[in-house]
Amino acid sequence: MNHENRISELTQEQTEFKRDIGVFGGVSIIGGIMIGSGIFYLGSYVLERTGMNSGLALICWIIAGLISLFGGLCYAELGTAMPKAGGRVIYLNEAFHPVVGFTAGFTDWLIGGPGSIAAVSIALMNVLQSFFDVSAFGVKAGAIVLIVALTVYNLFGVKAASMVQSLSMVAKLVPVIIVMLAALFVGSVSPDLSLESANTYAEANDTSILAMVAMAVVASLWAYEGWTNLNTVAEEIKNPKRNLPLALIIGIGGVTVLYTLFNFAIMKVLPHDEIVSMINNEDLYLGTAVAKKVLGSAGAIVVSAGMVLAMFGTANGMVLAQPRMYYAMAEEGHFFKSFAKLHPKYKVPTV
């Protein structure tokens, strides 16, 4: 295939896939993968790396959100120019060389994809273990059953998978928003958002504010990870030239607002000294502590429900998105041909 034909194929919107994902479905894939259990504890790492300065920690959450949004805008441009399944595999092929795209896709197939899905599934079962008497073997068996069930369900078409993703995202947001709004309205602490203590910390530790921000943003970026997965299913998005960038902007922008407000809500409930004491004692689940304070004994149940739903959405989102990269490698002719086959009825890669 010559270069002109190759570019023409990548830019046209005709496809064998079913374009069943709308804007909300796209937002659900992004939010479903991005918003995980980390919302309840990653704030501790950000605070720790900013010298326990509340104002600087919130700035870092916003900076990480803006970095993710800028990345999302770049992906929106790539996705509208080349609305094909495979995401970064396609982009790396075109920008550099097919070897680079294949290396990224093969690494994800061998380690990154299954490793991430397994880790999230085990973590989900560990949360349930605190409510049910389940052995270590039971946790692993439950995780395997979950992965197999999600995989089988996703074989019945992207419309069904997208619907579950949308429902799970809404369901996971309910407990998170309940905790956040309760904390914002009930919390009586007035957090000190000045940067004075950060300057003092920087001088005492022979560092700089910029270095502290850089380290803290790395921690907060982990919470934003996952937005790249939407482009993997670009070939299944309705009107991708409009809906793909819209879903990326709404999804990443909304998560940025949620993360910033949630961490501010924590500071509204827990006095700064208590936060510092918890982190120093390696009790990192600040969100859980807030839920227990504002909701009483029901707080732990609300948080656990939120964590389970969040991880379920993350697992389903990865099971939905990742096979499209392997499809793209096979379609390029660099991977097993069977991976490029779509189900004759449901039009999803099944191998």
Where are these regions (language model features)?
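Membrane-interface "cap" regions at the ends of multi-pass membrane proteins
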Residues: 1-55, 69, 73, 85
